[in-house]
UniProtKB/Swiss-Prot annotation:
Residue spans crossing the bilayer: 525-550
Name of the protein described by the UniProt record: Fusion glycoprotein F0
Glycosylation sites noted in the Swiss-Prot or TrEMBL record: 27, 70, 116, 120, 126, 500
Gene: F
Native source organism of the sequence: Human respiratory syncytial virus
Keyword Glycoprotein recorded: yes
Lipid linkage positions (S-palmitoyl cysteine): 550
Cytoplasmic side: 551-574
One Gene Ontology term, aspect cellular component: host cell Golgi membrane
Coiled-coil region(s): 76-96, 158-209, 481-516
InterPro entries with a match to the protein in the record: Fusion_F0_Paramyxovir
């Protein structure tokens, strides 16, 4: 009788979701900033998980005694096969309970050293599974340890003496009851399947009568359907080390999940949000194997509590921004590293750097605050003015101009450098745009794919309005000679400080070089002057010598009268 109602509800939900999606997607806007090679997608609303709601789910089991019916009837054989599967499932759950208890205990000891998490302690029991399987359990629990801490706390209490009987008694006359556990916490418990009464009071009496013959095949089918849920739950817990996520429809059917949401102590708006997005709720929920005891299988379902809803959210997309010099290897690059989801939260901003951890449904963003950082609202200034003095924007630098594309909500950012060919195409018209070197943006209007080299990107087809904000690429403001490379976790101020240090070093080097050159110049001048003086003196001496020599050559010889008389007399005397 429930199936037609579920179909009607499903159709209504789908129509409402389609209408909501079409209406809300019109509010999405996107702004591309050419100066920083980044884009901001706006118009989203928040659904931030701030806590957990835990509930205990039970399945009543039958302690099947030896079935004495071994007839040859085909339907009886099918029943016996299902009973064997049932017994094997119960045995597997019992072994799994031991292994997960021990794994939880070991995870509690290892978490402080590996992840600084603390899990609630559980009673140590013997583990009959292989070491490889135990290591798999431990690794899984280490990965989700902090997320399931509250669920493990409830699961631990169920292992105390009398807790299972307390739940079993509360569910004798109803399928849902609030039970106060020994630790003082009240939890909602639900019985989703009663295999005990069905097997003991309906199935086995039919099988064991009339010479072990079953005339109605519906009996076989009914048991297979009921047993299948237990078998699937066992399989999921076994494969996933006792902790499963998302919560499957075997753990909780849609009607059971909606009923549980309706009983949660939250506002009507929160209930409506969760009821309209049950698939997202399932993805962010956990099922935790607890105990099988007193003919009861009990497991904990941990659902998210969305304490922050309907606040504005936006997503930042970034891509490398490089210079476009033709000389290979001479370019410098800068990339904003603050990409991710942002949501307003109580006067500040919750930042989710791993955008893939958030789930988007239409214009609704479901994120877990455990994965967030709290930032001041001034972080928004980085989008319009990356050099603003109120918030130090985060960047990384390099000297490798790699071409790539980033798909945004309403288009694509294309970083095209070197000899890479970058194009945008329409499936009917072919290439409609070829990108030149640099960072550019294309909206999804009339564009189906973006190609960068040999890589093909498919753009989103979400409706909305795109805005291209032009501006001088900030990378052009930097000198390649002093630009710091390979800064992977830096900020604008840190990069500028390193540039200033480099410039100061260059200035100091120039001053030292100037002083050295000045000293060398003075010495050279003195040496040159001395040489010139020596040369002048030598030239002067040579000039004086030549002058005296020439003067001596040009002066006539004169003799006195006595000398002439003597000469003449001597001459005449001969």
């Amino acid at each position: 009788m429930e199936l037609p109602i579920l179909k009607a509800n499903a159709i209504t939900t789908i129509l409402a979701a389609v209408t909501f999606c079409f209406a809300s997607s019109q509010n999405i806007t996107e702004e591309f900033y050419q100066s920083t090679c980044s884009a901001v997608s706006k118009g989203y609303l928040s659904a931030l998980r701030t806590g957990w709601y835990t509930s205990v789910i039970t399945i009543e089991l039958s302690n099947i005694k030896e079935n004495k019916c071994n007839g040859t009837d085909a339907k009886v054989k099918l029943i016996n096969q299902e009973l064997d599967k049932y017994k094997n499932a119960v045995t597997e759950l019992q072994l799994l309970m031991q292994s997960t208890t021990a794994a939880n205990n070991r995870a509690r000891r290892e978490l402080p050293r590996f992840m600084n998490y603390t899990l609630n302690n559980t009673k140590k029991t013997n583990v009959t599974l292989s070491k490889k399987r135990k290591r798999r359990f431990l690794g899984f629990l280490l990965g989700v340890g902090s997320a399931i801490a509250s669920g493990i706390a409830v699961s631990k209490v169920l292992h105390l003496e009398g807790e299972v009987n307390k739940i079993k008694s509360a569910l004798l006359s109803t399928n849902k009851a609030v039970v106060s556990l020994s630790n003082g916490v009240s939890v909602l418990t639900s019985k989703v399947l009663d295999l005990k009464n069905y097997i003991d009071k309906q199935l086995l009496p039919i099988v064991n009568k009339q010479s072990c013959r079953i005339s109605n095949i519906e009996t076989v089918i009914e048991f297979q359907q009921k047993n299948n849920r237990l078998l699937e739950i066992t399989r999921e817990f076994s494969v996933n080390a006792g902790v499963t996520t998302p919560v499957s429809t075997y753990m909780l059917t849609n009607s059971e999940l909606l009923s549980l949401i309706n009983d949660m102590p939250i506002t009507n708006d929160q209930k409506k949000l969760m009821s309209n997005n049950v698939q997202i709720v399932r993805q962010q929920s956990y099922s935790i194997m607890s105990i099988i005891k007193e003919e009861v299988l009990a497991y904990v379902v941990q659902l998210p509590l969305y304490g922050v809803i309907d606040t504005p959210c936006w997503k930042l997309h970034t891509s490398p921004l490089c210079t476009t010099n033709t000389k290979e290897g001479s370019n410098i690059c800068l990339t904003r590293t603050d990409r991710g989801w942002y949501c307003d939260n109580a006067g500040s901003v919750s930042f989710f750097p791993q955008a893939e951890t958030c789930k988007v449904q239409s214009n609704r963003v479901f994120c877990d605050t455990m994965n967030s950082l709290t930032l001041p609202s001034e972080v928004n200034l980085c989008n319009v003015d990356i050099f603003n003095p109120k918030y130090d924007c985060k960047i990384m630098t390099s000297k490798t101009d790699v071409s790539s594309s980033v798909i945004t909500s309403l288009g694509a950012i294309v970083s095209c450098y070197g000899k890479t060919k970058c194009t945008a195409s329409n499936k009917n018209r072919g290439i409609i745009k070829t990108f030149s070197n640099g960072c550019d943006y294309v909206s999804n209007k009339g564009v189906d794919t973006v190609s960068v080299g040999n890589t093909l990107y498919y753009v989103n087809k979400q409706e909305g309005k795109s805005l291209y904000v032009k501006g001088e690429p900030i990378i052009n403001f930097y000198d390649p000679l002093v630009f710091p490379s390979d800064e992977f976790d830096a900020s604008i101020s840190q990069v500028n400080e390193k540039i200033n240090q480099s410039l100061a070093f260059i200035r100091k080097s120039d001053e030292l070089l100037h002083h050295v050159n000045a000293g060398k110049s003075t010495t050279n001048i003195m040496i040159t002057t001395i040489i010139i003086v020596i040369i002048v003196i030598l030239l002067s001496l040579i000039a004086v010598g030549l002058l005296l020599y020439c003067k001596a050559r040009s002066t006539p010889v004169t003799l006195s009268k006595d000398q002439l008389s003597g000469i003449n007399n001597i001459a005449f005397s001969n």
